[in-house]
Amino acid sequence: MTELAPKQITYCGVCTWPLEFCEFGISLPRCQSWLASKHPELFSTVYPNTPNPESVSASAPSADELASKLELATLSSDPKEAKIQAELLKKQAKHQLKQEKELTKKQNSKIIIKRIERNKRKHIISISGLEVFQIEPKKLAKTFASKFATGASVVKNAEKLDEVVVQGDVSDEAKEYIEKLLKEQEGLENVKVEPS
């Protein structure tokens, strides 16, 4: 008897669904551009009638392009299909605007690392501004505690926001680690990590 090998499924890096289901989501243009850049050999099989977005344009369609597609969809012969297409295009436009706003908010934010003197020769560092970048403070504190062999905890500051407090003067190493975390997220390479 022969054993069956499990089927290998590739998941989208944008919407995290299997590639065949991306067309039903609101981030289809971004999913297509991701697939074309990461798996160009799969793009022609999943989207056979669609031109490669890398050859057409590198970014997702703008709001004006989506509006023109919306007008074309309303001119369709089937009213139900036109209505569904119009709703999908509206959701795509809203989703794209929301993503752009979040990205600009993240790019304008900064992470502050403060070095505070505890005793004459002992210091702690306080890291604040992590909530915008979706970095969980508890996981970061645990990582710092194991990485630097020091005590680390999460406390609320005066503004009722979480900040990570690490014992010892490890501000340079913490800055490097946080910059590495931000470079892993798309579009956040230029975010400032400021020691003070």
From Swiss-Prot:
It comes from the Eukaryota. One of its GO terms (molecular function) is translation initiation factor activity. GO terms for cellular component: cytoplasm; ribonucleoprotein complex; ribosome. Keywords: Cytoplasm, Ribonucleoprotein, Ribosomal protein. GO terms for biological process: formation of translation preinitiation complex; translation reinitiation. It is found in: Cytoplasm. Residues 111-182 form the SUI1 domain. Interacts with the 40S ribosomal subunit. The SUI1 domain may be involved in RNA binding. PANTHER family: DENSITY-REGULATED PROTEIN (PTHR12789:SF0), DENSITY-REGULATED PROTEIN HOMOLOG (PTHR12789). Belongs to the DENR family. This is Translation machinery-associated protein 22.
